[in-house]
């Protein structure tokens, strides 16, 4: 995610000329101090760039226009140091097409009780200046985030950092290219969707690329590059005897390395952020790309199996959000249940393609037979996810809108080993429990594929949905089926009448 180092958030401080030159100078000085401190000490993922103080309609509008056209600016953070009449902000807010955060803070932490005079009161007016700005945001029906807190407090820093990560994911989404190697799995419904509407809504450029074009790139990979990658495998994974030098499946591992290098080159050369494969279209490919997909996900690419481009794109989005955070993010599928009384669990996995960023221990690299796809036994990494909090997220096309469904999870350690299971996995209890969680997921129409993450939580995804203007449904410990049904019906009416 090297591109994140080039991105920035613009900081615009609102005031007006009513208070005079001396007050405006203090406003500018305070804004610079806050900017410097946030950049140097807050641990934010993106750089803050202070813009000139917004004191007139024309000044503020010019900043918004520049923000829209900037290739580095992913969002705008505003602060009303003094009172800044909100009618001055109407043109800017009406045209701004980047995420917006209102930082409701003030320069001084404590009131100087014995020293307060009207000069102090005129300078430090965020308490009511922020409310004036907030009214205009509400009046214009703007999706926006409000962070309330002192600018040196860790809690405020964490909220700003969260918003920055989501804004960066929106920026990435607007430019995202998704390569589809083959089509969707035949006759599957939920992996379909309106690609034109997806580009309008999210920016996704989803296009088909013949598998034969990929095969040409794979076949051109050099022996030296393959051997170097095999050396890397031997360094970072535990290899089974079957794939070690001289092992029965060493040649299959060699082909898997060739696949990874070829696929990565294709994606890099084309500027793709996500991709899909399907076991029904492997013409010219030696084996189903399992290991390659796993490792490319760990490098930040979005992936979807069976042509699932919506999940691939969403996975890329969560990879961007979670960059540098503890915990991993992976393509996932609800595979089978454990229905023990009082301990109902879901075993999540896929045929091969689970990202090792969620591995609790050093993965095992192996080659085993796969009874689907009718190709040679494929390479794969074997591991399980660590216990802890997680989410499953599913993006679906409802015809007149996109819906993002999120379920909070409690991931648990495997109670027993799975010596015959030849794929990576995670074991979890959905919130509030399997009975309600699964029923709610099904009623919402969420897919059998999902994005599983232990790096970001549901609030990241709620804010992302707000920024993108799509429907959001959360299944958590407070969910009840009657209330969820009502929410679905209310949303249906809203999107038919208001969108």
UniProtKB/Swiss-Prot annotation:
Binding site for Mn(2+): 306, 333, 350, 449
Cofactor note: Binds 1 Mn(2+) ion per subunit.
Enzyme Commission code: 5.3.1.4
Gene Ontology BP terms: L-arabinose catabolic process to xylulose 5-phosphate
InterPro entries: Ara_Isoase_C (IPR024664), AraA_central (IPR055390), AraA_N (IPR055389), AraA_N_sf (IPR038583), Fuc/Ara_isomerase_C (IPR004216), Fucose_isomerase_N/cen_sf (IPR009015), Lara_isomerase (IPR003762)
Cofactors required: Mn(2+)
Signal peptide range: none
Keyword Isomerase: yes
Top EC class of this enzyme: isomerase
Keywords for this protein: Arabinose catabolism, Carbohydrate metabolism, Isomerase, Manganese, Metal-binding
Pathway entry: Carbohydrate degradation; L-arabinose degradation via L-ribulose; D-xylulose 5-phosphate from L-arabinose (bacterial route): step 1/3
Disulfide-bonded cysteines: none
Gene Ontology annotations for the cellular component aspect, listed alphabetically: cytosol
Catalytic reactions on record: beta-L-arabinopyranose = L-ribulose
Family: Belongs to the arabinose isomerase family.
Function: Catalyzes the conversion of L-arabinose to L-ribulose.
Name this polypeptide is given: L-arabinose isomerase
């Amino acid at each position: 995610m090297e591109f994140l180092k080039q991105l920035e958030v613009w900081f615009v401080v609102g005031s007006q000329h009513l208070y005079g030159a001396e007050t405006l100078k203090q406003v500018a000085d305070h804004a610079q101090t806050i900017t410097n401190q946030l950049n140097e000490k807050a641990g934010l993922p993106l750089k803050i760039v202070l813009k000139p103080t917004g004191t007139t309609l024309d000044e503020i509008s010019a900043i918004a226009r520049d923000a829209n056209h900037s290739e580095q600016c992913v969002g705008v953070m505003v602060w009303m140091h003094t009172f800044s009449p909100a009618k001055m902000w109407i043109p800017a807010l009406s045209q701004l097409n980047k995420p917006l955060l209102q930082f409701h803070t003030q320069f001084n932490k404590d009131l100087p009780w014995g020293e307060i005079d009207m000069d102090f009161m005129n300078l430090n007016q965020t308490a009511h200046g922020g409310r004036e700005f907030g009214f205009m945001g509400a009046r214009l029906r703007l999706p926006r985030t409000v962070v309330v807190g002192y600018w040196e407090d860790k809690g405020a820093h964490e909220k700003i950092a969260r918003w920055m990560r989501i804004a960066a994911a929106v920026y990435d989404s607007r430019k995202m290219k998704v390569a589809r190697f083959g089509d969707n799995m035949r006759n599957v419904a939920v992996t379909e969707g309106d690609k034109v509407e997806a580009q309008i809504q999210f920016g996704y450029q989803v296009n088909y690329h013949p598998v034969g074009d990929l095969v040409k790139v794979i076949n051109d990979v050099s022996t030296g590059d393959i051997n170097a990658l095999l050396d890397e495998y031997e360094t970072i994974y535990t290899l089974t005897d079957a794939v070690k030098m001289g092992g029965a499946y060493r040649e299959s591992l060699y082909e898997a390395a060739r696949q990874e290098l070829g696929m990565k080159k294709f994606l890099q050369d084309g500027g793709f952020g996500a991709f899909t494969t399907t076991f029904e279209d492997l013409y010219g490919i030696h084996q189903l790309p399992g290991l390659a997909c796993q490792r490319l996900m760990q490098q930040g690419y979005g992936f979807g199996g069976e042509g699932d481009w919506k999940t691939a794109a969403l996975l890329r989005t969560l990879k961007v959000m979670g960059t540098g955070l503890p915990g991993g993010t992976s393509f996932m599928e609800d595979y089978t249940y454990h229905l023990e009384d009082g301990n109902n669990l879901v075993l999540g996995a896929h045929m091969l393609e689970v990202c090792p960023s969620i591995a609790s221990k050093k993965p095992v690299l192996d080659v085993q037979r796969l009874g689907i796809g009718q190709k040679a036994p494929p390479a794969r990494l074997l591991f399980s996810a660590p216990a802890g909090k997680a989410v499953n997220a599913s993006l679906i096309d409802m015809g007149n809108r996109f819906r993002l469904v999120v379920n909070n999870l409690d991931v648990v350690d495997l109670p027993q080993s799975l010596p015959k299971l030849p794929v990576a996995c995670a074991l979890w209890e959905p919130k509030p429990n399997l009975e309600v969680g699964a029923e709610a997921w099904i009623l919402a129409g969420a897919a059998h594929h999902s994005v599983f993450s232990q790096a970001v939580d549901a609030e990241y995804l709620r804010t992302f949905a707000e920024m993108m203007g799509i429907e959001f449904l959360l299944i958590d410990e407070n969910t009840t089926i009657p209330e969820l049904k009502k929410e679905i019906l209310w949303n249906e009416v809203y999107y038919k009448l208001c969108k």
